[in-house]
Swiss-Prot record:
Subunit record text: Interacts (via DM14 domains 1 and 3) with shrb; the interaction is direct and blocks access to the surface involved in shrb polymerization. This interaction may be required for the ESCRT-III complex role in multivesicular body formation.
Subcellular location: Cytoplasm; Cytoplasm, Cytosol; Apicolateral cell membrane; Cytoplasm, Cell cortex
UniProt protein name: Coiled-coil and C2 domain-containing protein 1-like
Keywords noted in UniProt: Cell membrane, Coiled coil, Cytoplasm, Endosome, Membrane, Notch signaling pathway
InterPro entries: C2_dom, C2_domain_sf, C2_Freud, CC2D1A/B, CC2D1A/B_DM14
UniProt lineage: Eukaryota, Metazoa, Ecdysozoa, Arthropoda, Hexapoda
Family statement: Belongs to the CC2D1 family.
Region described as Disordered: spans on this chain: 1-135, 157-176, 186-269, 418-492
Biased composition (Acidic residues): 25-47, 86-100
Function: Phosphatidyl inositol monophosphate binding protein involved in endosomal protein sorting through regulation of the endosomal sorting required for transport (ESCRT) pathway. Required for full activity of the ESCRT-III complex core component shrb/shrub, probably by preventing its inappropriate polymerisation. Required, but not essential, for the efficient generation of intraluminal vesicles (ILVs) in multivesicular bodies (MVBs). Involved in a late stage of the endosomal pathway targeting transmembrane proteins of the plasma membrane for lysosomal degradation.
Length: 816
């Protein structure tokens, strides 16, 4: 019950030996019996069996006597069997073997299958020897498949025209089968004739029979003329004993083209020469012959399509080809040497089309996108998936750039690759750049000629292959130098003017930085270089169509030097007012000088903060005030009437910042003590202990120096503490805690120090202010003990927000 199941013996699979290329051997095969003796064996055995059993059996039929050969034929066969057959004769016969030639042409002569060496067999002892064929595709099978392909194509077209969808689908399936068989036959594989779809009746669409030439019989039993031999198979015609199936021709057969016949004959010679060279081991020569064979296919197709072909350049026979190729290479080398001295004639190759000049950025991006899209399509047509994916990514980059440009957003132009033959992308101040004409790339190159050498480098002329004559290109018409601009596009719009101004101003700072570096002013050069880099963001915004506030632009270096050197030393006589006009002029000059000083100080403050926009705004304002001040001084010096002026109320938002500190520093300044309440005010020695809370119950502790013999000491000592303004725990310290100051009186000999008072300063104001500066009463617990302590606590910027101050000034402005 629980015993293991006995393993079944492995069954021997019955294989059909015919699929391995062997003849199927029957099960009752007797190797001891002779051929042709099976017919009489059964009757003899039956007669013998009847005699043994006592019955009278029928008399056996007499065996036919074997036909004896004459003695002369027997001697001839023996002599032939003893004769040695040379291998050269077999190789000569194999040069025109259609099977081997088809196989060599099918794989391009580079990856040929392992050849089977023919075995010399003695002639059979019969008058008619049986010819054996290798299981490869013959010329007749390939031609039959091609004829059936034409039949089924025409039949499918007729069925579709007649509206018979059932027939069209049936013919389509047969056409697909024929295409698969044709592909296998071209590769040299074995084709079963029974698998070829049968012939179909092809009739013209109009219902009338096609005209039949007078010399041909209309009977269907008459075999049609054999079709032209394809370039992949051997050109030898089929043997007379091989029957050709009759086909129904759609159109009357046209007489063969003598040019095609001549080229096919020469192509056949080159095929045989390539096969012979390969067998002899000369691979390079075989490759050259195969290249010529492939180039013959191109020219034959051109001739069959009705194009004009010049046979004066057809390669010579294979025996003379190597000398001819060597001569052509020498001529090409001579022409290459003579090329710099003699101006060559223009080649008949049509020049590449010159694209129109791009008038704006969008058009330039579109041109480059179309270029990469064409290269991607060519790569897909060549089945080059790697190249197609690579150029597909570039196409996606350009599509995203065009979307960003249309949306008015900044576009990373420096990340976009430039296709060959195209110049840089146009800018606002540069003229439109047209892509330079480049040589045609490989997808658009003309078909290869037979002048290709063994190494793959083409010769200078196409004298080795018959090619179609090309027409000389017509001279290009002169293009207009001006580019038409659409009506809704303004050439000098605001965005382009801003771009031009920004580029000019950036160039000035670049030159100023170079000059400052040459003069040895490294700090000044660094400052100019920072301003030069700051223009990049403005240029990106302007190129994307965003408006730019030109009032925030930095003043050019030349005007800045004039602004710095605007102050002049005047004498007392020049400042004495002589009358009311001089008095008004002096007041105006003082007011303008005050305004100028305020602008320069605020400019320096914003510069130290790193606020470039604020610095540029006040610098431009200072430049305007400087011009007004110069005009007033000039009028006074020349005794001319003063210019008209008026006062305005101007508001300024000033950002307070302690620029001498960093963001991670807090400065504690113990300034002075005021009137300490002590017993000996003139002899007391005091100092201050400082305690600042830190994280994890730690604290920063320090003390000042001892100031002797005064109750109002000036300490003026500064201490810096490292803080972490982005840490939330540290922010809670500023909200809840404070700095503790303890004022001590120094004790005498063997006496300890005495606490005078304590001051606690809250840090919460530093959340919105950058400085705390005040005097605080000295406390003992909650009781004042008398005296005060002046303390200052500073940070670079407030902890939470920036400290803004709104200032309104009475501003003197000269009328234009």
């Amino acid at each position: 019950m629980f015993s293991r199941k006995k393993p079944e013996p492995a069954k021997r699979r019955q294989h059909d030996l015919s699929q391995f290329g062997l003849t199927e051997i029957p099960d009752d095969f007797d190797p001891s019996a002779g051929y042709g003796e099976d017919d009489g064996g059964d009757s003899d055995l039956e007669a013998e069996l009847a005699a043994i059993t006592g019955g009278e059996g029928a008399k056996p039929k007499p065996k036919p006597k074997a036909k004896l050969l004459p003695a002369s034929d027997l001697d001839k066969m023996i002599a032939d069997s003893l004769r040695d057959v040379s291998d050269d004769d077999d190789d000569d016969n194999l040069e025109s073997d259609p099977d081997l030639l088809g196989e060599l042409s099918g794989i391009g002569g580079l990856e040929e299958a392992e050849e089977e060496e023919p075995v010399a067999q003695p002639p059979a002892a019969s008058e008619e020897p049986v010819q054996t064929f290798l299981p490869t595709t013959t010329v007749d099978t390939l031609s039959i498949i091609k004829q059936r392909l034409e039949m089924y194509k025409q039949a499918e077209a007729n069925a579709k025209t007649a509206g018979d969808s059932g027939k069209a689908r049936r013919f389509g399936r047969g056409l697909k089968t024929l295409k698969d068989l044709h592909r296998q036959a071209a590769a040299g594989k074995s084709i079963n004739v029974d698998d070829i779809p049968p012939e179909v009746s092809v009739k013209p669409i109009g219902g009338q029979a096609p005209p039949v030439p007078a010399e041909e019989s209309p009977a269907p039993s008459t075999p049609a003329s054999p079709p032209p031999v394809p370039s992949r198979a051997a050109p030898d015609p089929p043997t007379p004993g091989t029957p050709v199936e009759p086909t129904t021709s759609v159109a009357p057969t046209s007489p063969p083209n003598p040019l095609v016949t001549q080229m096919r004959s020469r192509q056949t010679d080159y095929k045989a020469a390539a096969l012979q060279s390969k067998r002899s081991g000369d691979i390079s020569t075989a490759l050259q012959f195969l290249k010529v064979v492939k180039q013959f296919d191109v020219v034959i197709k051109m001739c069959e399509d009705g194009q004009e072909v010049d046979l004066s350049d057809m390669p010579p026979p294979p025996a003379e080809f190597l000398e001819f190729l060597k001569k052509m290479q020498e001529e090409a080398a001579a022409e290459a040497v003579a090329e710099p001295t003699a101006a060559p004639e223009p080649t008949p190759v049509a020049p590449a089309p010159v694209l129109a000049a791009a008038t704006n950025m969008l058009e330039a991006l579109q041109q480059r996108l179309e270029k990469y899209q064409s290269v991607e399509a060519a790569a897909k047509a060549e089945n080059n998936s790697g190249k197609a994916r690579r150029f597909g990514r570039i196409v996606k980059q350009y599509e995203d750039a065009i979307k960003l440009y249309k949306a008015g957003k900044p576009v990373p132009y420096d990340e976009l690759p430039v296709p060959p033959g195209f110049g840089p992308l146009p800018t606002a101040d540069a003229a439109p750049v047209a892509p330079t004409p480049s040589l045609p790339t490989s997808p658009t190159s003309p078909p290869p000629t037979a002048s290709t050498s063994a190494g793959g480098t083409p010769s200078s002329s196409s004298a080795t292959t018959p090619t179609a004559p090309r027409k000389a290109p017509s001279p290009p018409k002169p293009k207009e130098l001006t580019t038409r601009t659409s009506g809704n596009q303004q050439k000098n719009n605001i965005a382009e003017q801003q771009m031009k101004l920004l580029l000019e101003r950036q160039k000035e700072f670049k030159l100023a930085a170079i000059e400052a570096k040459k003069a040895g002013e490294i700090d000044q050069a660094k400052e100019y270089l920072k301003i030069f880099k700051g223009f990049d963001s403005l240029l990106n915004a302007a190129s994307s169509g965003l408006p730019v506030d030109l009032s925030t632009l930095p003043v050019p270096p030349s005007q800045r030097d004039n602004l710095e050197a605007s102050f002049a030393i005047v004498s007392a006589e020049e400042c004495d007012p002589t009358d009311d006009i001089c008095e008004i002029g002096v007041r105006m000059e003082e007011q303008l000088a005050k305004q100028l000083m305020m602008c320069k100080n605020t400019r320096d403050h914003h510069k130290a903060m790193g606020d470039v926009a604020g610095m540029n705004r006040f610098e431009n304002l200072a430049l305007t005030v400087q011009k007004d001040l110069d005009l007033v001084r000039y009028s006074k010096r020349k005794n001319e009437p003063l210019p008209k002026f008026h006062y305005e109320k101007r508001s300024f938002n000033i950002v307070h910042c302690n620029t001498d500190l960093t963001d991670s520093e807090l400065e504690i300044v113990v300034v002075r003590g005021i009137s300490y309440n002590v017993a000996n005010p003139k002899d007391v020695d005091t100092y201050v202990r400082v305690e600042f809370p830190l994280l994890n119950d730690e604290s920063f502790k320090t003390k000042t120096n001892v100031i002797r013999d005064t109750s109002s000491p000036d300490y003026d000592e500064r201490f810096k503490v490292d803080i972490q303004r982005t840490n939330r725990q540290f922010q809670r310290i500023f909200k809840r805690h404070g700095v503790k100051f303890e004022i001590y009186s120094r004790g005498g000999f063997l006496r300890s120090d005495t606490l005078i008072g304590t001051v606690n300063v809250k840090l919460q104001p530093l959340e919105t202010k950058c400085e705390i500066h005040d005097t605080y009463d000295l406390m003992d617990g909650r009781k004042q003990v008398g005296g005060k302590l002046e303390v200052k606590i500073r940070v670079r910027n407030p902890i939470l927000t920036k400290q803004m101050e709104h200032i309104t000034e009475k501003w003197l402005v000269l009328d234009a």
